[in-house]
């Protein structure tokens, strides 16, 4: 194994409620990836995941749950994470895969893809939430991990920024849906647009509001 030491969330990050890893995840030389997802709840687009292995020599100040920091801060942290992490990768499952598998299994698939795409092999993985996909290395779920494990916080930021960019691109094609504002979540604006303009090819047909629109013949 490499000589790299795992990040110490107590000494380097000062988290209010840090996750205390087992001795296994605390071994010298362990390269531990943090994994998180964004986009389980929206009615449109892919679920996007990220995997990040932080470099303990470059602790990144300001890491937090991506939902609790501003877009400007997320963009700044995205650049820093990509510049200083030992490895990072994105994964995804498209809307048609979500329809085929269901959102839970599609999310697990997207997480597997992110871990597999890492440029350096992770010896272990910490995953936000309470479920763990089948992986080639040991893994542990961490409830509210995006606020308790720095590497998961970093993954949440990369996934959020990546998916938001996709929603901005979709908004450029279909501005009448307001994707730049709600990012595909079932807000009143999105529901009204779905009823008025119909479902797009990018909409998740297995999700109730989209299925209802299609049943009424509302297709863009």
UniProtKB/Swiss-Prot annotation:
**Listed name of the protein:** Ribonuclease HII
The residues that the entry says bind a divalent metal cation are 36-37, 128
Q: List the disulfide bonds.
A: none
- What is a single Pfam family found in this protein's UniProt entry? RNase_HII
Family designation: Belongs to the RNase HII family.
CDD domains hit by this protein: RNase_HII_bacteria_HII_like (cd07182)
Which species? Alcanivorax borkumensis (strain ATCC 700651 / DSM 11573 / NCIMB 13689 / SK2)
Query: Per its Swiss-Prot or TrEMBL entry, what cofactor is needed?
Result: Mn(2+); Mg(2+)
Which leading EC class covers this enzyme? hydrolase
Q: Which PANTHER family match?
A: RIBONUCLEASE H2 SUBUNIT A (PTHR10954), RIBONUCLEASE HII (PTHR10954:SF18)
